[in-house]
Curated annotation (Swiss-Prot):
Classification via SUPFAM superfamilies: Pectin lyase-like
Biological classification of the source: Eukaryota, Fungi, Dikarya, Ascomycota, Pezizomycotina
Residues the record marks as active site: D228, H251
First-listed, main subcellular location of the protein, grouped into a coarse class: secreted
Name under which the protein is recorded: Probable endo-xylogalacturonan hydrolase A
Region listing for Disordered, in residue ranges: 20-49
A GO cellular component entry from the record: extracellular region
Cystine residue pairs: none
Keyword line: Carbohydrate metabolism, Cell wall biogenesis/degradation, Glycoprotein, Glycosidase, Hydrolase, Polysaccharide degradation, Repeat, Secreted, Signal
Amino acid sequence: MISLNSIFLLSLVGLSRAAPSRSETSPDRTIKPRAACTPTAGGSSSTDDVPAIQEAITSCGDGGTIVIPADTTYYLNSVLDFKGCSNCDFQVEGLLQFTSSTDYWNGKTAMISVSDIDGLKLRSVTGSGVIDGNGQESWDKFAEDSSYKRPTLLYITGGSNIEVSGLRQKNPPNVFISVKGDTSNAQFTSLTMDATSNSDNLPKNTDAFDIGASTYVTISSVAITNDDDCVAFKPGANYVTVENVSCTGSHGISVGSLGKSSDDTVQNVYARNITMINSSKAAGIKTYPSGGDHGLSTVKNATFEDFIVDGCDYAFQIQSCYGEDDTYCEENPGDAVLEGIVVKGFTGTTSDKEDPVVANLNCGSKGTCDVTISGFEVKAPSGDAKILCGNTPSDLGVTCSSGASG
């Protein structure tokens, strides 16, 4: 018979044998390197390199790196879809050149589609990477046929943690970058964006950034040359910061347009340290009036700070009759709700187009116009600085003249 003491001693022996000795190997904590893929370029515009790139995304997209090497051209003859990317690092050091085919692109939404992706770095580490939308033929066709539907170069919808940096983007058929679909946490930094036509047909509708339904979007250190909005805060934009940006030839930093056919809201947007050159306006708000199928426009907590105005037609503009004529708006006045709109620290000189007027602030008579202006030191070439006002508050902060329109 085995005594209780014997059982206890045997148990201790078993425990001592089960316990690991100090000489045993510790668990491996070595960090495994990210998978890396370099797609093979076809070397000819007759070969579509999109399948090779998407195969690389499939192979290395889950936490890996895809490299477009320097001094190499990849010809993209179809839509590039980032499906399969999750925390992937897509490095463009060479050239991604899209086909100019107007037949192929007609009706397409995007040239580069980033849909519901969680974690993407689209960047050039060396600063040499270029994405060419090859949009000249699309601009020429649109000049002849305004029904021609052109794609956005980079279309981001849904997803989160998107970073785009260090790249040059050029000549999109339409908008450069669109962010919508409740995207969150998107950053765009150190970019050069230019749309330049070599014909008499302007690169119409080449907004640099259309920021729609999204939260926590940052745009910084970007140089833009285009023929439409520099940055447009579209319906649903919330917590968007734009800083250290220069725009040439654009329509400015714009809220809107809002309220065309639905109730639209933009809130918590901040634009700071902006240089606007030869643009139709440096900054402004565009809302449709009441009546018809138009909805209610609401803009809350929008700040425009430290703008340098160089040859822009207006330094600041509020349009409450956007998209309609004066006769319509007399019967259906603007009803937009503008709350917490701050304009401060504007300096520089406008163009001579509206001289002596430097700003045109036409708030809707049926709406709310909570706007304050301070440190506004913009002048027209003549040296005058006339500000046209309509339905603005008595504590606006600047001296007003009648005659506001738009």
